[in-house]
Amino acid sequence: LGQYLRELNNEILPALIDEYALDTEKLAYGGYSLGGLAATMSLWETDAFAAVFSLCGSFWYPGVADFIEEHVPKNYSAQVYLQNGIREGEGHNNRLCDAYSYAQRVHTALQATCGAKTVLDDYGHHDRQSERLNAALRWVERVL
């Protein structure tokens, strides 16, 4: 994940900025599931993004919640939006069954360090994807 984020920050993002004349003060990065985890972890790699959002971020990966609780993000001034469901992980018999508790830990940590806007809804991981994305995009419009 670190290599991906470094490539995004050092190669892909500069190329996009050059090609499309993007306003570097209003860049947002977000994703769903593993993409949400990647967007969240970008907070420790770069301060290029003014807003970061994660929908059902895969915070259950080993060591992720611990890292987020123990380290202050490089981009602590970013606007952050996290949304997870209380039924994420239902039906699994591995560490995924605790997805909700990992999400709670990450939400609490990023509220403390970044003032993150957090939403814990009543749904599972794959439920209401369009609704969740629309809520996140409305949030991005408000904060940027």
Feature map (PLM): residue ranges:
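Non-catalytic cap/lid and distal C-terminal segments of serine-dependent acyl enzymes
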Residues: 1-144
